[in-house]
Amino acid sequence: MNDSEFHRLADTLWLTIEERLDNWDGDSDIDCEINGGVLTLSFENGSKIIINRQEPLHQVWLATKQGGYHFDLKGDEWICDRSGATFWDLLEQAATQQAGEAVSFR
């Protein structure tokens, strides 16, 4: 994967998250902000989830209250380089915990 392809895939990931939150109809308020390639989700309780891209490594990084995760693209899924979990699974687990209600991005 070259840099431009990586950025296209990361942009698609960011857009998917933003669109899902725009359509969010849960009781919790989840704000989404993108600034300089960093996507920040802010929750009512003051907690945050930070998602950023690491261009030199062609990775997406996810920082949550539970910890930090690094994802490599394998096939058509972003996969955690330590646990093998998918990006969507870990994001949904963290967002659900931080929002206090079930959050789905799929």
Curated annotation (Swiss-Prot):
Signal peptide positions (record): none
Example GO BP: iron-sulfur cluster assembly
Disulfides per UniProt: none
The organism's place on the tree of life at top rank: Bacteria
Keywords: Iron, Metal-binding
Gene Ontology cellular-component annotations: cytosol
Entry GO MF terms: ferric iron binding; ferrous iron binding
Keyword Metal-binding on entry: yes
Family designation: Belongs to the frataxin family.
Function: Involved in iron-sulfur (Fe-S) cluster assembly. May act as a regulator of Fe-S biogenesis.
NCBIfam families: FeS_CyaY (TIGR03421)
Alphabetized PANTHER family for the sequence: FRATAXIN (PTHR16821), FRATAXIN, MITOCHONDRIAL (PTHR16821:SF2)
Record's protein name: Iron-sulfur cluster assembly protein CyaY
